[in-house]
């Protein structure tokens, strides 16, 4: 991935993020990593000037997205995840970059996924809310989909100790404002 004109990310995006056995470092850019190395996708979604946040059971806010299914490309996965987690359809997509991930687990999260090194592609886009989240079995249960001003979103994710996600929303808003 190349840094090809995106604004310099803030310090909250420079830190390594650890989730379970995976360390992830955000690499800004507008060039996709090779498809065979993409294991996950996330979107900072907007409806007009408001950001969209989903909350899962227990109240934790999340950025919509998830793991690619066998044979699925990242855009198909993104569309599926938006239906499942936000009851939404994708209208536009702009790449922000990707997390370069390394897992110390002995096996991949799922057999079809790249391992031990892979990418979590992240972008932003406009969505249309068309219904309730489908909440398929085996996934996180989304209990709320909310539209919020960006300052509220940032505060919310910081409260939940996720300054990295707050920074992704902030970066997406900054790029949208300059377009």
Give short role names for the model-derived ranges.
Residues 101-133:
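Active-site-adjacent beta-strand/loop module that shapes the phosphate/pyrophosphate-binding cleft
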Residues 46-85:
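Conserved Nudix-box catalytic region and its N-terminal flanking loop in Nudix hydrolases
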Residues 43, 95, 123-125:
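A structural signal for short, well-ordered beta-strand segments
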Residues 89-99:
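A short coil-to-beta-strand element that immediately follows conserved catalytic motifs
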Residues 38-40, 56-58, 63, 116-120:
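Short connector loops at helix/strand junctions that flank enzyme active sites
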Residues 121-126, 134-167:
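NUDIX/MutT-family hydrolases
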Residues 27-29, 37, 74, 79, ...:
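Short acidic (Asp/Glu) patches
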